């Protein structure tokens, strides 16, 4: 009833979830147990979410079927291979690692460690790592090499001959590769461009859609919530 009351007074879903956690902590401190994951409470939360339509308000996640369509469209473009390998690597790395778009463009050559199992990428700093302690994301080889982020990135590194500095760079004068790092806005524009080319309305998607798509797809596959959050860097379950 308390959550419903807050909801009718305009509280957001993120606020309701924080309040629920706080209530659970207070009960614990007083020696009482409150199961915040009790079916009745979960049903109440889901009912509020449906009424608010909170899922529809945000940008949509790019799920695996759309991810494959994007990669197929990139491969079919009448562009130089070097451009296609850059763009497909951005998309595949961004999705498979649950990266924020600013994390994608911040990757340097020295952050990459190709290992027999796949690829380790060092993240020197992120939105939720304000002290710059850094962490590592590990990406395995995929069975289907066409959609494998590790295979794609290897080809991009080889064709671009990048051996230091930013991994994802701008092109100047056609297909000439510069030393300048891409901006995170460029990642968002690339996503929208290829969605449109695939016949998918891009207005409901953003640069965040790769990361949320990874989290959603992993959850639907049965991956534990804390494992997903460790990969994406989420501090809460609010996508």
Stretches found by the model and what they are:
Residues 1-239:
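Extended, non-catalytic subsegments within catalytic or DNA/protein-binding/adaptor domains
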């Amino acid at each position: 009833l308390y959550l419903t009351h807050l909801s009718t007074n305009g509280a957001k879903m993120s606020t309701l979830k924080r309040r629920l956690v706080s209530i659970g902590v207070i009960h614990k401190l007083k020696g009482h147990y409150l199961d915040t994951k009790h079916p009745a409470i979960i049903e109440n939360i889901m009912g509020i979410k449906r009424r608010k339509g909170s899922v529809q308000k945000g940008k949509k996640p790019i799920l695996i079927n759309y991810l494959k369509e994007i990669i197929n469209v990139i491969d079919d473009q009448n562009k130089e291979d070097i451009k296609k390998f850059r763009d497909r690597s951005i998309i595949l790395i961004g999705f498979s690692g649950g990266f924020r778009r600013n994390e994608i463009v911040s990757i340097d050559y020295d952050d990459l460690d190709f290992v027999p199992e796949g690829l380790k990428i060092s993240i020197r700093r992120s939105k939720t790592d304000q002290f710059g302690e850094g962490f590592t994301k590990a990406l395995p080889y995929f069975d289907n090499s066409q959609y494998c982020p590790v295979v794609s990135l290897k080809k991009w590194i080889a064709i671009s001959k990048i051996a230091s500095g930013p991994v994802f760079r701008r092109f100047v004068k056609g297909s000439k590769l510069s030393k300048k790092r891409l901006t995170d806005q460029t990642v968002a524009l690339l996503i929208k461009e290829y969605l449109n080319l695939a016949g998918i309305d891009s207005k409901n998607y953003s640069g965040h859609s790769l990361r949320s798509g990874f989290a959603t797809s992993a959850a639907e596959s049965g991956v534990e919530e804390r494992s997903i959050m460790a990969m994406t860097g989420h501090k809460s379950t609010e996508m």
